[in-house]
C-alpha cells in the first residue's frame, strides 16, 4: 500500500535505534500526548499499550491520552487542551481530516512534532507538517478479507454485503477498495 500522499511504505523493522541514539532521546526529557480518534476497542487498547511501553523504554513521558469517541469536535477540544501542556510529540489518528486540520496545524506551529496513525489532516505535507504516518497494509488487509470471505462462502459462492464507511478515513477506503477489487 502507498501512504495517503503516495508515499512508498517502509517496514517497521527498518527503524533501528542504536544505544547511543536511545541515550540521546532519554536525555531530551521529551513528553508525548496520545490523541486517539476512538479508544473503546481492543485495537485501540493494544496501540495505546504499545505506545506507552515504547515511550517508557525511550524515556519519553506520556502526559495525556484522549479518546474523541469518533467526534471531530471533541478531538479538536482535546488537542486544544493538550497544547496547554506543550507536549513535544503528539501521536494521533485524526477523526476527520478536514474538521481537525486547523487544530493539528496549530499544534505543529506551537512546536509539537506530529506522528499520525492511519489518517492525516487535509492539506498536510509529509516531512513538512508532520514527521510520519504509520499504518498496517490496509489494502493487503482488504485483499485478505476478500479471500477469507470467498473461502467461507465455498465453491458455490453466495452473496455477501459490503458496507461502505462514508467517513473520510484513508485506511478504511483502502480496505474497502481492495475487497471490492478482489
Segments from the language model and where they lie:
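A residue-level marker of the well-folded mature domains of exported/periplasmic proteins
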Residues: 1-182
Amino acid at each position: 500500500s502507498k501512504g495517503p500522499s503516495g508515499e512508498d511504505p517502509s517496514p517497521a523493522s527498518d527503524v533501528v535505534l542504536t544505544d547511543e541514539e536511545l541515550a540521546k532521546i532519554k536525555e531530551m526529557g521529551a513528553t508525548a500526548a496520545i490523541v486517539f480518534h476512538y479508544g473503546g476497542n481492543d485495537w485501540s487498547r493494544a496501540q495505546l499499550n504499545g505506545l506507552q511501553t515504547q515511550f517508557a523504554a525511550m524515556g519519553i513521558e506520556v502526559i495525556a491520552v484522549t479518546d474523541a469517541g469518533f467526534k471531530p469536535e471533541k478531538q479538536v477540544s482535546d488537542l486544544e487542551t493538550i497544547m496547554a501542556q506543550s507536549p513535544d510529540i503528539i501521536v494521533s489518528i485524526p477523526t476527520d481530516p478536514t474538521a481537525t486540520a486547523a487544530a493539528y496545524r496549530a499544534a505543529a506551529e506551537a512546536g509539537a512534532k506530529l506522528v499520525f496513525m492511519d489518517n492525516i489532516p487535509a492539506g498536510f505535507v509529509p516531512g513538512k507538517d508532520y514527521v510520519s504516518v504509520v499504518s498496517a497494509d490496509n489494502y493487503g488487509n482488504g485483499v485478505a478479507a476478500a479471500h477469507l470471505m470467498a473461502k467461507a462462502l465455498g465453491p458455490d459462492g453466495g452473496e455477501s454485503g459490503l458496507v461502505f464507511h462514508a467517513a473520510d478515513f484513508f485506511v478504511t477506503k483502502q480496505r474497502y477498495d481492495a475487497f471490492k477489487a478482489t
